[in-house]
Structure formats: structure tokens, C-alpha cells
Amino acid sequence: MLPMTFMRSNRTGMFLISALFAAGNLCAQQVDFEMMTWQEVKQAMAAGKTTALIYNGGTEQRGPQNVNGGHTLMGHATVIAIARKLGTAIAAPVMPFSVNNANAALPGTIGLTGPLFASLNEQVAEQMIKNGFKNVVLMGDHGGGQKELGEVAKKLDAKYAAQGIRVVFCDEVYEKANADFDKYLAAHGYPLSSHAGIPDTSEMLYLGSDKGWVRKELVATALGDPMRKAGEARDPNANRVNNGIQGDARRSTPELGKLIFEMKVDAAVKQIRQLLPAK
């Protein structure tokens, strides 16, 4: 029979080995820049995570049923999922402001001008390059700012090309994913909606149903001003609801939210891999 002191020592050693293994595994899975130490970032880059993902959220009224930080909250979940699926990326802190403008009638928006938004993204991208990242991907969860992100990426990609550093704009996380989801909704008989409608409300229900992102008791009455088809003029005699919702969000569900979330992640990962092919 082994001495008790040996058994205790052996158990302690096994515990320490298990703890070290768990810590190392956690570090390998971590992709959230603001939740990492500088040593963990350096180790991750050395292990191949050399792409920085800069995702822009936004603070904006989202109808009576959704919290104002929806773009940023969804953006954080989206960019973390993209980074994990890529396997070669780290997610920078999500930007909480977009190209937009406040409105006293619906006091939930904090916006930036286009030039300031572009300058902010340019400086953050260059900071990530100074940190040692070899690729930077710019993305946005809000329609305002897409043009500026494309321009910044083009400018910095040219500036750093001689150093072998790439800066690219992933637009399909917004444009393609939303277009594909709209087609799905139309094909399955859902009503038209955009801002604070079925896409936004459903995704926030899926990601934050238990976190207070959506006032669930208000979804059943989440009906805004009717959507107009492309080129269709607004009826001057129609009464405006003006509650921040564009269209009808009443049929929003977490299941639909899961679908649009996965569409965004898949579209982004596919495009990023095309923009930054493995060497």
C-alpha cells in the first residue's frame, strides 16, 4: 500500500496538471481582445491568430420593444462567433457608435458624422497593426457607415501593402446576410420589416432573451409605419406611427433570430476567407 503522503502528493500534482491544462485550453479558445491579457494576445498571435476583427455596432433607438444598444450587443456576439469559426482571428472591442444622428422625438440614438466614424476606424485599425496583427477586417452591424468602412479599408490596404499587411472590408455580414434573410421571410409569408422589425427583434430575442435585450411583453404590439417598396412614395394622407419600427415585428421569434445570426456569421467567414486566403 502506498504511503498517505505519497498519495496526497500525487493527487496535488494531478490537480496542478489539470489546472494548467484547463488554463491553457481556455487561453487557446479566447478570442475576445478586451478579455485577454497582453501575454495571451501575444501567445495567440504566435499561434496563428494574426487577424484582427473590428466590428462596429451602434447606439440607436430600436422601437419600443428593443434596447438602444442592440447593434453593439448583437455585434459582440456576432464578431466572437466569426472569430471562433475562422480560428485565426481575435475580435477587437466592438465600436458602440455608428454614422447616425440623435432625434428628440425618439431619444435613443447617439451618432457620429461620417468623417469622424471613418477616422475612428482608421486609428483603431492602425493600432491593431501596431500591436502586431498582419490582417485587419472592418465590419459593421448598421447601414450607416458601410461606405466609410469600405473607404478606410481601401486606403489602409494600399498604405500597408508593402509590409505584407492586409486591411479589408467585409460587407456581406450586413448586405448579403440581410438580403438573404429578407428573401427567406418573403418566401415564408412573413410581413415586410426592416429597422426594429423581425430581423432585429428576432436576433435580439435569440441572443438576449434572458438578458433583458427585448421587452417581450411588447413584441405582440410591435407594429410600426408600413414598409414601402422600392420607388414607392409615402402616402401623404396616412397617419404616421413614428415609434421607431419600420414594418411589422409582431411575428419575431428566437428561432428566426438564430437563422439570421447564423447567416451573418457564415457570410462573414466565407467572405473573409476569400479576401484573406491562407498562405
Model features per residue range: what roles?
Residues G13-N25:
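Bacterial N-terminal signal peptides
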Residues Q29-P115, S119-V137, D141-K279:
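Extended, histidine- and acidic-residue-enriched regions that form the cofactor-binding/catalytic faces
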